[in-house]
């Protein structure tokens, strides 16, 4: 019986995938293949390449200033180029072709002009991941074979169908958004948390523009920032798509870390996310073992 691991989208919440993998392996459950969408493709690629230990060490050492250092502003095709981040991975991790990784791996992207779902199963691993994480309006699209590719979460946020196509008999899926939608723009949280990296960036921009933009009197409603509106809108859309797709293509098992308190760009909070991924597996480990132990 081949076990497939489908890692869902969710930006910084995706660090929980590391905890999920650690907990599965500790329990003696070793996936035979892995696929991912957006941040799920990043963690999945590190796992498939045998680089998860080094990747986790890098995550745990990340600070807000490191996140800000990867923000290369462009405003052409997106707010950020994403080149600094990809260059970092090329410099610090081996960029093997997808087909040469130690474990079967694939990433999901979306063809920008047709809306088609694209499965990236060969070529540069770094380029495949970069295409899968290209969140519209935030990161610029990636051109591959003449096709502009953006975030796979637009069409398949939790790629159960891809895991099946790769030959999985049983699929363990990880959904990072099940308890998030509708909470970020509540009346009690109208602005970005100053503790998030994007909140820090927005604060600096606001300081630069002080005297140019109208101020909001204390106590009055303050509209959400542009990045918050964008990210919340994408999050709502992906949650609805994920629910619809998994209703027709259900996994054999679902792991759902509780990450409502996590901002999509809290990349510096890896330790908390990893621990939550471990907790989510521990909470349903008995059922998971029973499922995996079924005779093939």
In which residue ranges do the predicted regions lie?
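Patatin-like phospholipase
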Residues: 1-37, 45-296
